[in-house]
């Protein structure tokens, strides 16, 4: 996801950023999804002592809900 965001930034640098809101939406979608995936991996990791009481199903449900909210906000930003 981060590599896709970097490709989008490079493309914007080469071609231009005429529809700037769609560029921002694409980059924020990539970065937001990467951050949510890292949070899911931290919560599901069995070696992590901080989230021992959290079941993996709850962590995955949080990931899905936050991803849904993220993409609804991005779709709203696109107009």
From Swiss-Prot:
Record's bilayer topology term: Multi-pass membrane protein
GO cellular component terms attached to this protein's record: oligosaccharyltransferase complex
KW Transmembrane helix (keyword) present: yes
The entry's keywords: Apoptosis, Endoplasmic reticulum, Membrane, Transmembrane, Transmembrane helix
Signal peptide: none
Localization terms from the record: Endoplasmic reticulum membrane
PANTHER family: DOLICHYL-DIPHOSPHOOLIGOSACCHARIDE--PROTEIN GLYCOSYLTRANSFERASE SUBUNIT DAD1
Quaternary structure, from the entry: Component of the oligosaccharyltransferase (OST) complex.
Protein name: Dolichyl-diphosphooligosaccharide--protein glycosyltransferase subunit DAD1
Organism (species): Zea mays (Maize)
């Amino acid at each position: 996801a981060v590599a896709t965001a970097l490709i989008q930034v490079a493309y914007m640098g080469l071609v231009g950023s005429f529809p700037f809101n769609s560029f921002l939406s694409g980059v924020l979608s990539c970065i937001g999804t990467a951050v949510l995936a890292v949070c899911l991996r931290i919560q599901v990791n069995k070696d992590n002592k901080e989230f021992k009481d959290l079941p993996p199903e709850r962590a995955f449900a949080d990931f899905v809900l936050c991803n849904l909210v993220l993409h609804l906000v991005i779709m709203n930003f696109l107009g």
